[in-house]
Amino acid sequence: MDITDIRDQIDVIDDALVKLFLQRMQLSAQIATYKKQHNLPVHAPAREEEILKKVSEQAGADFEVYTRALYTTLFELSRSYQNTLY
């Protein structure tokens, strides 16, 4: 397999990631609506820590730090988007 083949596979994964990201952000908007209706804060650190723990375990030692960075960024983006809707 040459580099072009590998990049083609990454492109397919990137396409899927964008679709999943958009779905996640749409759900984040629904969460923002719920939080607003129930007077809940946008930031939910306990929930974020729960997710970080779970995904870190799923990723394993080799990728834990990268997985935590990815999800921390996702949380920041979700909070930012929720704040625009709140």
Predicted regions and their residues:
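Domain-level signature for soluble enzymes in the chorismate/prephenate branch of the shikimate pathway
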Residues: 1-86
